[in-house]
From Swiss-Prot:
Residues bound to Ca(2+): T10
PROSITE patterns to which the protein is assigned, alphabetical: PEROXIDASE_1
An example Gene Ontology molecular-function term: metal ion binding
Organism of this sequence: Cycas revoluta
Keyword set includes Cytoplasm: no
GO CC annotation, single: extracellular region
Protein name: Peroxidase 8
Keywords recorded for this protein, A-Z: Calcium, Cell wall, Heme, Hydrogen peroxide, Iron, Metal-binding, Oxidoreductase, Peroxidase, Secreted
Annotated positions binding heme: H9
Length: 15
């Protein structure tokens, strides 16, 4: 999972 600059939001997250 790659964490964006927002810190909380992640890309490709399926949780």
């Amino acid at each position: 999972e790659l964490v964006t600059l927002s810190g909380a939001h992640t890309i490709g997250q399926a949780r």
